[in-house]
UniProtKB/Swiss-Prot annotation:
<keyword id="KW-0540">Nuclease</keyword>
<keyword id="KW-0496">Mitochondrion</keyword>
<dbReference type="GO" id="GO:0004519">
    <property type="term" value="F:endonuclease activity"/>
</dbReference>
<feature type="transmembrane region" description="Helical">
    <location>
        <begin position="15"/>
        <end position="37"/>
    </location>
</feature>
<keyword id="KW-0106">Calcium</keyword>
<dbReference type="GO" id="GO:0005739">
    <property type="term" value="C:mitochondrion"/>
</dbReference>
<comment type="similarity">
    <text>Belongs to the LCL3 family.</text>
</comment>
<feature type="binding site">
    <location>
        <position position="113"/>
    </location>
    <ligand>
        <name>Ca(2+)</name>
    </ligand>
</feature>
<keyword id="KW-0479">Metal-binding</keyword>
<feature type="active site">
    <location>
        <position position="108"/>
    </location>
</feature>
<protein>
    <recommendedName>
        <fullName>Probable endonuclease LCL3</fullName>
        <ecNumber>3.1.-.-</ecNumber>
    </recommendedName>
</protein>
<dbReference type="InterPro" id="IPR035437">
    <property type="entry name" value="SNase_OB-fold_sf"/>
</dbReference>
<feature type="active site">
    <location>
        <position position="116"/>
    </location>
</feature>
<dbReference type="Pfam" id="PF00565">
    <property type="entry name" value="SNase"/>
</dbReference>
<feature type="active site">
    <location>
        <position position="156"/>
    </location>
</feature>
<feature type="domain" description="TNase-like">
    <location>
        <begin position="59"/>
        <end position="217"/>
    </location>
</feature>
<dbReference type="GO" id="GO:0046872">
    <property type="term" value="F:metal ion binding"/>
</dbReference>
């Protein structure tokens, strides 16, 4: 009995449906893997990791507040993916200053200015401690979502910060304006509001009418911007 001849090899074109399907599958897998990595794995450690696309596309970053340093800024440790990626139970969030070195963003709350604390031998403004204590109680040691808008001259990330409370998601800048412990940011060159400037100004006007916080000072009020111009810039 004659042997069965082998099946001749077939040359498959790169345009063959099977090849195209396989290529599409590999490309899709790589793309989804990259998206998963950038969204849920890769950390933004410092302001140097903030790419133009993150800022231009208003990408939200989820993370943990490690320290509140002033009435309108705090340290933010990025935890991509949050609890679903093990943060807080499988993946440890650093707590010591040494561990946190070069691992956090300094966040400057957008659209507002809080009373200046005592710095460099200069006196604190009225309500500076109230603003600091309020912000500590509201966000310190808690998870927040930030939307970076820009990086200022001090390498701080000017951002909108939002936090979940029992009554829903809250805008931290807006809540500070409601208390009267902050005013709408006066500087024009570095002002960042997102789409919320009109809303912020209405909240400020309401607190002013009720004479809440700094507005209780009446004509004695020196705004944070004025205070900095006099005490730090010698104007």
């Amino acid at each position: 009995m004659a042997p069965i001849p082998p099946t001749p090899a077939q040359d498959i074109s790169i345009l063959h449906p099977k090849v195209l399907l396989l290529s599409a599958g590999i490309t899709t897998s790589l793309f989804l893997g990259y998206r998963f990595y950038t969204r849920y794995v890769r950390r933004v450690r410092t302001y140097l990791d903030l790419t133009p696309s993150i800022i231009e596309n208003n990408k939200k970053l989820y993370g943990y507040v490690t320290r509140v340093g002033d009435g309108d800024n705090f340290r933010f440790y990025h935890t991509p993916g949050g609890l679903l990626m093990g943060w807080g139970w499988l993946r440890k969030i650093p707590t010591t200053r040494k561990e946190l070195k070069d691992e956090t963003l300094m966040i400057r709350l957008c659209g507002i200015d809080a009373p200046e604390g005592a710095h460099f031998g200069k006196p604190a403004q009225p309500f500076a401690d109230d603003a600091l204590n309020w912000l500590r109680g509201y966000v310190d040691g808690k998870y927040v979502t930030i939307t970076p808008y820009s990086i200022d001259q001090y390498k701080r990330v000017v951002a909108r910060a939002q936090i979940w409370k029992w009554t829903g998601k809250k805008d931290v800048s807006a809540e500070m304006l409601k208390t009267g412990y902050a005013i709408v940011y006066e500087g024009k060159a570095e002002a960042e509001f997102g789409d919320n400037e009109d809303w912020y100004r209405k909240l400020e006007a309401h607190s002013k009418r009720l004479r809440k916080g700094v507005w209780s000072l009446g004509k004695k009020l020196t705004t944070p911007g004025e205070f900095k111009r006099v005490h730090y810039r010698g104007e």
